[in-house]
């Protein structure tokens, strides 16, 4: 049995057509089904529907053989035991700092609100900047508006939400897209099967971008 961990939303919607190229199609619509384990048209392949931030954990610990996760999630994840063999070039966005429009750069210790705590620590450590990291799980844009933080670090797509709240994107930390991740033990035990799937997905990605 080959188990693939996916999260609902944009990643799932963009991944399913790629899996279809490999003949893997869910037998019911994951967006409408309440099931968290979805069979596919291949009897020995199933999908696990999990939270986006949990995909690397399921794969690392062998509960799933493969998964699809955003590079932002993988950058924040501190575990081991994952291969990242393929950039699927889907769900593309940017991980950026943002602050109030026209605000001067704060002097001294910086307060940064984000859910990407590990990313923030590494980013500012590389700059030699002293920061206080404030972990939030959502509505990041509020933090600078009410004086909770000087800046935020968040995923930015169009930037419209930032601008609607009086903020502007500032420093680019990373360009984000979704990646295929594979459990290291699964790669050894089911190498031929998984490598064939990787090769098929790679061709599908290349074909999509040529077209």
From Swiss-Prot:
UniProt cross-references to CDD domains, sorted A to Z: PBP2_HisGs
Pathway as given in its UniProt record: Amino-acid biosynthesis; L-histidine biosynthesis; L-histidine from 5-phospho-alpha-D-ribose 1-diphosphate: step 1/9
Keyword Nucleotide-binding: yes
Gene Ontology CC terms: cytoplasm
Location(s), subcellular: Cytoplasm
EC number: 2.4.2.17
PROSITE patterns, alphabetized: ATP_P_PHORIBOSYLTR
Keywords of this entry: Amino-acid biosynthesis, ATP-binding, Cytoplasm, Glycosyltransferase, Histidine biosynthesis, Nucleotide-binding, Transferase
Pfam families tied to this protein: HisG
Function of the protein: Catalyzes the condensation of ATP and 5-phosphoribose 1-diphosphate to form N'-(5'-phosphoribosyl)-ATP (PR-ATP). Has a crucial role in the pathway because the rate of histidine biosynthesis seems to be controlled primarily by regulation of HisG enzymatic activity.
UniProt note: domains: Lacks the C-terminal regulatory region which is replaced by HisZ.
NCBIfam families: hisG (TIGR00070)
Subunit structure and binding partners: Heteromultimer composed of HisG and HisZ subunits.
Family that this chain belongs to: Belongs to the ATP phosphoribosyltransferase family. Short subfamily.
Protein name as annotated: ATP phosphoribosyltransferase
């Amino acid at each position: 049995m080959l188990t693939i961990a996916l999260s609902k939303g944009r990643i799932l919607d963009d991944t399913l057509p790629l899996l279809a190229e490999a003949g893997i199609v869910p037998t019911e619509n994951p967006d409408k089904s309440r099931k968290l384990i979805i069979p596919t048209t291949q009897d020995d392949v199933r999908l696990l529907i999990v939270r986006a931030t949990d995909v690397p954990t399921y794969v690392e610990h062998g509960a799933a053989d493969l998964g699809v996760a955003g590079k932002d999630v993988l950058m924040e994840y501190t575990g081991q035991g994952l291969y990242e063999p393929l950039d699927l070039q889907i769900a593309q966005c940017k991980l950026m700092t943002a602050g109030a429009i026209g605000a001067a750069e704060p002097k001294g210790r910086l307060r940064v609100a984000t859910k990407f705590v590990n990313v923030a620590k590494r980013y500012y450590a590389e700059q030699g900047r002293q920061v206080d990291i404030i972990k939030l799980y959502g509505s990041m844009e509020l933090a600078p508006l009410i004086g909770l933080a000087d800046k935020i670090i968040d995923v930015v797509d169009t930037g419209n939400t930032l601008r609607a709240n009086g903020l502007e994107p500032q420093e680019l930390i990373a360009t984000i897209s979704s990646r295929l991740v594979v459990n290291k033990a699964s790669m050894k035990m089911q190498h031929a099967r998984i490598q064939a799937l990787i090769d098929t997905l790679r061709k599908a990605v290349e074909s999509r971008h040529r077209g």
